[in-house]
Amino acid sequence: MQNAGSLVVLGSINADHILNLQSFPTPGETVTGNHYQVAFGGKGANQAVAAGRSGANIAFIACTGDDSIGESVRQQLATDNIDISPVSVIKGESTGVALIFVNGEGENVIGIHAGANAALSPALVEAQRERIANASALLMQLESPLESVMAAAKIAHQNKTIVALNPAPARELPDELLALVDIITPNETEAEKLTGIRVENDEYAAKAAQVLHEKGIRTVLITLGSRGVWASVNGEGQRVPGFRVQAVDTIAAGDTFNGALITALLEEKPLPEAIRFAHAAAAIAVTRKGAQPSVPWREEIDAFLDRQR
Protein backbone atom coordinates (compact mmCIF):
# COMPACT_ATOMS: atom_id res chain seq x y z
CA MET A 1 0.00 0.00 0.00
CA GLN A 2 1.43 3.37 -1.03
CA ASN A 3 0.80 6.84 0.38
CA ALA A 4 -2.35 8.32 -1.11
CA GLY A 5 -3.90 11.74 -1.45
CA SER A 6 -6.48 12.80 1.12
CA LEU A 7 -10.17 11.96 0.80
CA VAL A 8 -13.24 13.75 2.13
CA VAL A 9 -16.52 11.81 2.29
CA LEU A 10 -19.76 13.76 2.68
CA GLY A 11 -22.80 11.71 3.54
CA SER A 12 -25.24 10.06 5.90
CA ILE A 13 -25.02 8.20 9.19
CA ASN A 14 -27.76 5.74 10.18
CA ALA A 15 -28.49 3.11 12.76
CA ASP A 16 -29.51 0.05 10.72
CA HIS A 17 -32.25 -2.20 12.11
CA ILE A 18 -31.78 -5.41 10.11
CA LEU A 19 -34.21 -8.34 9.95
CA ASN A 20 -33.17 -11.47 8.08
CA LEU A 21 -36.06 -13.54 6.71
CA GLN A 22 -36.57 -16.19 4.07
CA SER A 23 -38.68 -14.06 1.72
CA PHE A 24 -39.94 -10.48 1.66
CA PRO A 25 -43.52 -9.97 2.89
CA THR A 26 -46.17 -8.99 0.37
CA PRO A 27 -48.56 -6.12 1.22
CA GLY A 28 -50.71 -7.16 4.17
CA GLU A 29 -48.52 -10.16 5.04
CA THR A 30 -46.62 -10.69 8.30
CA VAL A 31 -43.40 -12.70 8.05
CA THR A 32 -41.32 -14.07 10.91
CA GLY A 33 -37.61 -13.33 10.69
CA ASN A 34 -34.76 -15.62 11.73
CA HIS A 35 -32.16 -13.02 12.77
CA TYR A 36 -32.27 -9.40 13.98
CA GLN A 37 -29.46 -6.97 14.67
CA VAL A 38 -28.79 -3.27 15.02
CA ALA A 39 -25.63 -2.16 13.21
CA PHE A 40 -24.18 1.16 12.09
CA GLY A 41 -24.84 2.17 8.50
CA GLY A 42 -25.80 5.01 6.17
CA LYS A 43 -24.35 5.18 2.69
CA GLY A 44 -21.93 7.94 3.62
CA ALA A 45 -20.70 6.23 6.77
CA ASN A 46 -20.42 2.85 5.03
CA GLN A 47 -18.30 4.36 2.26
CA ALA A 48 -16.19 6.26 4.76
CA VAL A 49 -15.57 3.05 6.72
CA ALA A 50 -14.72 1.17 3.52
CA ALA A 51 -12.21 3.85 2.59
CA GLY A 52 -10.75 4.06 6.09
CA ARG A 53 -10.35 0.30 6.46
CA SER A 54 -8.84 -0.03 2.99
CA GLY A 55 -6.17 2.54 3.76
CA ALA A 56 -7.41 5.99 2.76
CA ASN A 57 -6.43 9.22 4.52
CA ILE A 58 -10.02 10.24 5.17
CA ALA A 59 -12.20 12.84 6.88
CA PHE A 60 -15.99 12.53 7.08
CA ILE A 61 -18.49 15.41 6.88
CA ALA A 62 -21.78 14.24 8.40
CA CYS A 63 -24.33 14.77 11.19
CA THR A 64 -25.56 12.66 14.08
CA GLY A 65 -28.19 13.33 16.69
CA ASP A 66 -27.30 14.16 20.29
CA ASP A 67 -28.46 10.70 21.33
CA SER A 68 -26.58 7.67 22.63
CA ILE A 69 -26.55 5.96 19.23
CA GLY A 70 -24.90 9.04 17.71
CA GLU A 71 -22.17 8.97 20.34
CA SER A 72 -21.60 5.25 19.73
CA VAL A 73 -21.41 5.77 15.96
CA ARG A 74 -18.83 8.54 16.31
CA GLN A 75 -16.68 6.40 18.59
CA GLN A 76 -16.85 3.49 16.14
CA LEU A 77 -15.98 5.65 13.12
CA ALA A 78 -12.90 6.94 14.93
CA THR A 79 -11.65 3.36 15.33
CA ASP A 80 -11.98 2.86 11.55
CA ASN A 81 -9.17 5.32 10.72
CA ILE A 82 -11.60 8.18 10.02
CA ASP A 83 -11.12 11.82 11.06
CA ILE A 84 -14.51 12.58 12.65
CA SER A 85 -13.81 16.22 13.55
CA PRO A 86 -16.16 17.38 10.73
CA VAL A 87 -19.05 15.27 12.12
CA SER A 88 -21.61 17.67 13.64
CA VAL A 89 -23.83 16.77 16.59
CA ILE A 90 -27.33 18.21 16.05
CA LYS A 91 -28.97 19.26 19.32
CA GLY A 92 -32.46 17.87 19.87
CA GLU A 93 -32.36 15.62 16.81
CA SER A 94 -32.16 11.83 16.53
CA THR A 95 -29.54 9.98 14.53
CA GLY A 96 -30.81 8.67 11.18
CA VAL A 97 -32.48 5.26 11.03
CA ALA A 98 -32.72 2.58 8.33
CA LEU A 99 -35.17 -0.34 8.46
CA ILE A 100 -33.76 -3.21 6.40
CA PHE A 101 -35.18 -6.57 5.35
CA VAL A 102 -32.72 -9.15 3.98
CA ASN A 103 -34.11 -12.25 2.23
CA GLY A 104 -32.69 -15.75 1.88
CA GLU A 105 -30.81 -14.80 -1.29
CA GLY A 106 -29.03 -11.93 0.45
CA GLU A 107 -31.09 -9.28 -1.35
CA ASN A 108 -32.40 -6.31 0.63
CA VAL A 109 -35.11 -3.67 0.74
CA ILE A 110 -34.50 -0.53 2.79
CA GLY A 111 -36.55 2.36 4.18
CA ILE A 112 -34.83 5.32 5.86
CA HIS A 113 -35.68 8.20 8.19
CA ALA A 114 -33.18 11.03 7.70
CA GLY A 115 -33.13 12.36 11.26
CA ALA A 116 -29.97 14.41 11.81
CA ASN A 117 -28.84 13.74 8.24
CA ALA A 118 -31.35 16.38 7.07
CA ALA A 119 -29.40 18.99 9.05
CA LEU A 120 -26.29 18.64 6.86
CA SER A 121 -26.80 22.13 5.44
CA PRO A 122 -24.87 24.21 2.89
CA ALA A 123 -23.68 26.29 5.86
CA LEU A 124 -22.08 23.21 7.44
CA VAL A 125 -20.50 22.40 4.07
CA GLU A 126 -19.16 25.96 3.80
CA ALA A 127 -17.57 25.57 7.23
CA GLN A 128 -15.54 22.69 5.73
CA ARG A 129 -14.52 24.65 2.59
CA GLU A 130 -10.80 24.52 3.32
CA ARG A 131 -10.89 20.79 4.04
CA ILE A 132 -12.68 20.06 0.74
CA ALA A 133 -10.46 22.44 -1.23
CA ASN A 134 -7.28 20.80 0.06
CA ALA A 135 -8.44 17.22 -0.50
CA SER A 136 -7.46 15.09 -3.47
CA ALA A 137 -11.00 13.73 -3.82
CA LEU A 138 -14.54 14.25 -2.53
CA LEU A 139 -16.90 11.25 -2.40
CA MET A 140 -20.66 11.80 -1.98
CA GLN A 141 -24.02 10.03 -2.20
CA LEU A 142 -27.65 11.24 -2.20
CA GLU A 143 -28.86 10.56 1.36
CA SER A 144 -27.82 14.14 2.22
CA PRO A 145 -29.73 17.30 1.19
CA LEU A 146 -29.15 17.90 -2.52
CA GLU A 147 -28.30 21.59 -2.02
CA SER A 148 -25.45 20.52 0.28
CA VAL A 149 -24.17 17.97 -2.22
CA MET A 150 -24.22 20.74 -4.82
CA ALA A 151 -22.40 23.17 -2.53
CA ALA A 152 -19.65 20.66 -1.79
CA ALA A 153 -19.28 19.76 -5.48
CA LYS A 154 -18.86 23.43 -6.39
CA ILE A 155 -16.13 23.94 -3.79
CA ALA A 156 -14.32 20.81 -4.96
CA HIS A 157 -14.63 21.67 -8.65
CA GLN A 158 -13.31 25.20 -8.09
CA ASN A 159 -10.24 23.79 -6.34
CA LYS A 160 -9.57 20.86 -8.72
CA THR A 161 -10.56 18.29 -6.10
CA ILE A 162 -11.85 15.14 -7.85
CA VAL A 163 -15.63 14.85 -7.41
CA ALA A 164 -16.90 11.26 -7.14
CA LEU A 165 -20.65 10.74 -6.87
CA ASN A 166 -22.48 7.54 -6.01
CA PRO A 167 -26.00 8.63 -7.09
CA ALA A 168 -27.89 6.56 -4.51
CA PRO A 169 -30.72 6.42 -3.66
CA ALA A 170 -31.89 6.68 -7.27
CA ARG A 171 -33.29 10.04 -8.32
CA GLU A 172 -33.13 12.50 -11.17
CA LEU A 173 -30.33 15.06 -10.87
CA PRO A 174 -29.86 18.54 -12.34
CA ASP A 175 -27.36 18.88 -15.17
CA GLU A 176 -25.70 21.63 -13.12
CA LEU A 177 -24.59 19.02 -10.57
CA LEU A 178 -23.64 16.35 -13.10
CA ALA A 179 -21.38 18.85 -14.89
CA LEU A 180 -19.31 19.13 -11.70
CA VAL A 181 -18.81 15.36 -11.34
CA ASP A 182 -15.60 13.61 -12.48
CA ILE A 183 -16.50 10.01 -11.52
CA ILE A 184 -20.02 8.61 -11.20
CA THR A 185 -20.93 5.11 -9.98
CA PRO A 186 -24.62 4.34 -10.52
CA ASN A 187 -26.09 0.86 -10.36
CA GLU A 188 -28.48 -0.24 -13.12
CA THR A 189 -31.54 1.34 -11.48
CA GLU A 190 -29.75 4.62 -10.83
CA ALA A 191 -28.30 4.71 -14.34
CA GLU A 192 -31.80 4.32 -15.80
CA LYS A 193 -33.12 7.11 -13.56
CA LEU A 194 -30.35 9.44 -14.74
CA THR A 195 -30.40 8.56 -18.45
CA GLY A 196 -33.77 7.03 -19.28
CA ILE A 197 -31.97 3.95 -20.64
CA ARG A 198 -32.69 0.53 -19.12
CA VAL A 199 -29.34 -1.18 -18.64
CA GLU A 200 -30.20 -4.72 -19.79
CA ASN A 201 -26.81 -5.64 -21.28
CA ASP A 202 -23.40 -4.20 -22.15
CA GLU A 203 -24.75 -2.42 -25.23
CA TYR A 204 -27.27 -0.47 -23.18
CA ALA A 205 -24.70 0.14 -20.45
CA ALA A 206 -22.49 1.79 -23.07
CA LYS A 207 -25.41 3.93 -24.26
CA ALA A 208 -26.24 5.01 -20.72
CA ALA A 209 -22.59 5.83 -20.08
CA GLN A 210 -22.50 7.97 -23.22
CA VAL A 211 -25.46 10.04 -21.99
CA LEU A 212 -23.56 10.72 -18.77
CA HIS A 213 -20.37 11.57 -20.69
CA GLU A 214 -22.36 14.11 -22.67
CA LYS A 215 -23.37 15.76 -19.39
CA GLY A 216 -19.69 16.34 -18.65
CA ILE A 217 -18.69 13.28 -16.61
CA ARG A 218 -15.36 11.80 -17.70
CA THR A 219 -15.47 8.45 -15.86
CA VAL A 220 -18.68 6.41 -15.69
CA LEU A 221 -18.77 3.14 -13.74
CA ILE A 222 -22.14 1.36 -13.90
CA THR A 223 -22.25 -1.44 -11.33
CA LEU A 224 -24.03 -4.54 -12.65
CA GLY A 225 -24.29 -6.75 -9.56
CA SER A 226 -22.91 -10.23 -10.23
CA ARG A 227 -21.96 -9.21 -13.80
CA GLY A 228 -19.33 -6.77 -12.59
CA VAL A 229 -18.97 -3.15 -13.72
CA TRP A 230 -19.29 -1.33 -17.04
CA ALA A 231 -16.34 1.07 -16.99
CA SER A 232 -16.30 3.90 -19.52
CA VAL A 233 -13.77 6.71 -19.80
CA ASN A 234 -14.62 9.39 -22.35
CA GLY A 235 -16.68 6.87 -24.30
CA GLU A 236 -14.14 4.03 -24.27
CA GLY A 237 -15.91 1.25 -22.36
CA GLN A 238 -15.37 -2.29 -21.15
CA ARG A 239 -16.99 -4.64 -18.65
CA VAL A 240 -14.79 -5.56 -15.70
CA PRO A 241 -16.11 -8.80 -14.15
CA GLY A 242 -16.31 -9.29 -10.41
CA PHE A 243 -15.49 -12.31 -8.26
CA ARG A 244 -17.80 -15.28 -7.69
CA VAL A 245 -18.70 -15.74 -4.02
CA GLN A 246 -21.69 -17.07 -2.07
CA ALA A 247 -23.60 -13.94 -1.04
CA VAL A 248 -25.08 -13.86 2.46
CA ASP A 249 -26.03 -10.17 2.67
CA THR A 250 -25.58 -7.48 0.00
CA ILE A 251 -26.48 -4.47 2.20
CA ALA A 252 -23.10 -2.73 1.98
CA ALA A 253 -21.77 -4.19 -1.28
CA GLY A 254 -22.10 -1.00 -3.29
CA ASP A 255 -20.82 1.20 -0.48
CA THR A 256 -17.82 -1.05 0.08
CA PHE A 257 -17.09 -0.95 -3.65
CA ASN A 258 -17.19 2.85 -3.71
CA GLY A 259 -14.99 3.39 -0.67
CA ALA A 260 -12.40 0.88 -1.81
CA LEU A 261 -12.48 2.18 -5.39
CA ILE A 262 -11.69 5.78 -4.49
CA THR A 263 -8.94 4.59 -2.13
CA ALA A 264 -7.29 2.63 -4.94
CA LEU A 265 -7.60 5.53 -7.38
CA LEU A 266 -5.98 7.89 -4.86
CA GLU A 267 -3.11 5.39 -4.68
CA GLU A 268 -2.83 5.99 -8.45
CA LYS A 269 -3.80 2.47 -9.41
CA PRO A 270 -4.92 2.22 -13.08
CA LEU A 271 -8.72 2.17 -13.36
CA PRO A 272 -9.07 -1.58 -14.17
CA GLU A 273 -6.82 -2.45 -11.21
CA ALA A 274 -8.74 -0.08 -8.93
CA ILE A 275 -12.02 -1.70 -9.98
CA ARG A 276 -10.58 -5.16 -9.31
CA PHE A 277 -9.50 -3.99 -5.83
CA ALA A 278 -13.01 -2.62 -5.19
CA HIS A 279 -14.58 -5.84 -6.51
CA ALA A 280 -12.48 -7.81 -4.02
CA ALA A 281 -13.58 -5.63 -1.11
CA ALA A 282 -17.24 -5.96 -2.11
CA ALA A 283 -16.90 -9.72 -2.61
CA ILE A 284 -15.69 -10.10 0.96
CA ALA A 285 -18.45 -7.83 2.28
CA VAL A 286 -21.32 -9.83 0.76
CA THR A 287 -20.17 -12.99 2.56
CA ARG A 288 -20.88 -11.30 5.92
CA LYS A 289 -23.99 -9.93 7.63
CA GLY A 290 -24.63 -6.25 8.31
CA ALA A 291 -23.44 -3.02 6.77
CA GLN A 292 -20.29 -1.75 8.49
CA PRO A 293 -19.60 -5.08 10.25
CA SER A 294 -19.17 -6.63 6.79
CA VAL A 295 -16.61 -4.14 5.47
CA PRO A 296 -13.13 -5.69 5.14
CA TRP A 297 -9.77 -4.28 6.24
CA ARG A 298 -6.91 -3.70 3.80
CA GLU A 299 -4.99 -6.83 4.71
CA GLU A 300 -8.10 -8.93 4.01
CA ILE A 301 -8.53 -7.35 0.56
CA ASP A 302 -4.87 -7.86 -0.33
CA ALA A 303 -5.01 -11.48 0.85
CA PHE A 304 -8.17 -12.11 -1.20
CA LEU A 305 -6.50 -10.72 -4.32
CA ASP A 306 -3.36 -12.78 -3.69
CA ARG A 307 -5.51 -15.92 -3.70
CA GLN A 308 -6.93 -15.00 -7.13
CA ARG A 309 -3.51 -14.94 -8.81
Show where each model-derived region lies.
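Conserved phosphate-binding/catalytic loop of the ribokinase/pfkB sugar-kinase fold
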Residues: S85-I90, I100-A137, L142
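Glycine-rich phosphate/adenosyl-contacting loop at the front of the ribokinase-like
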Residues: M1-C63, S68-T79, Q246-V248
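Beta-strand->loop->alpha-helix junctions that form or flank phosphate-binding loops
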Residues: L10, H35, I61-D66, S85-T95, ...
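Conserved phosphate-binding/catalytic region of the ribokinase-like
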Residues: M1-L7, R171-E176, D202-R309
